[in-house]
């Protein structure tokens, strides 16, 4: 059979049949229709609230994707990243004063609870919000399998081991492999850096003294380097931000990969996908392919999001009333 796609208003809609053929199996306890009777308006409620959030701050789309990523990489997609407390994942080094969007999830949860009290998990709400953030920014849409439970504990130590923008490519690939994701997932999910912002603290090491020899990262395009040195001077405010993709700051597209071919990746972990020695036999060809075909990127990104969203720890857990605390 032929796979089918529809292009609608700039969005790519991949059919369920196509996704089933292209992506690895979703965990058995997850189903797109699990709330069809218990919360029939769930999808519309979440999308409406995400629209409101993006209208208030367009950057929130990228923030919700990142929040979902940081959740799924620690104990699976169980909304543990949303929990408050002394061992909160929010306080882990990669997350503190960095990961954002918690208030948006609170607002969505309140709207869902008003319609369907005690039915829908925070983990499912976060997964749907991430999907809608992509779609509403011009990216692909896909059916989200639902039925995740909310975790009962946070894991700050594991959150401290999230993939870092300062790590070499082999370390990043290994961390993805440790949770069951492959090299294609590394590149496709990195494509989420096609929108959003990054703080100077996350890339200023590339601008002046990258190797300890007093020189910048040689893979960084010179005009971009000069601009970034102005934005993030030595001794400057590390909390200032720069767009991850200057070509289309708030749009979900394949410009991120085109940037990498020109040495315009903002983070070291972005540019090494194309420019590092290890990339030659691992990630470089995918970067080149995605730069040529937005459809191919959208297809693989969708599959990677489905795989990542299927990282769950069995059926244990609960449906939290408040996403910040266990019941």
Swiss-Prot record:
Cited CDD domains: secretory_peroxidase (cd00693)
Active site at: 70
The cellular location(s) given in this protein's UniProt record come to: Secreted
Gene3D superfamilies documented for this protein = 1.10.520.10, Peroxidase, domain 2 (1.10.420.10)
UniProt site (Transition state stabilizer): 66
Note the Pfam families from the entry. peroxidase (PF00141)
Keyword line: Calcium, Disulfide bond, Glycoprotein, Heme, Hydrogen peroxide, Iron, Metal-binding, Oxidoreductase, Peroxidase, Pyrrolidone carboxylic acid, Secreted, Signal
Q: Which GO terms describe its molecular function?
A: heme binding; lactoperoxidase activity; metal ion binding
**Protein residues bound to heme b:** 193
Glycosylation: residue positions? 155, 182, 209, 239, 247, 281
Cofactor or coenzyme needed: Ca(2+); heme b
Query: How, per the record, is the cofactor bound?
Result: Binds 2 calcium ions per subunit.
Annotated Ca(2+) 2 binding lies at 194, 245, 248, 253
Give EC number(s), comma-separated.
1.11.1.7
EC supergroup of this enzyme: oxidoreductase
Catalysed reaction, written as an equation: 2 a phenolic donor + H2O2 = 2 a phenolic radical donor + 2 H2O
Which residues does the record list as Pyrrolidone carboxylic acid (modified residue)? 29
List the PANTHER family hit by this protein, alphabetically: PEROXIDASE 59 (PTHR31388:SF264), PEROXIDASE 72-RELATED (PTHR31388)
| Role summary | Removal of H(2)O(2), oxidation of toxic reductants, biosynthesis and degradation of lignin, suberization, auxin catabolism, response to environmental stresses such as wounding, pathogen attack and oxidative stress. These functions might be dependent on each isozyme/isoform in each plant tissue.
Listed name of the protein: Peroxidase N
State the organism of origin: Armoracia rusticana (Horseradish)
What is the primary gene name for this protein?
HRPN
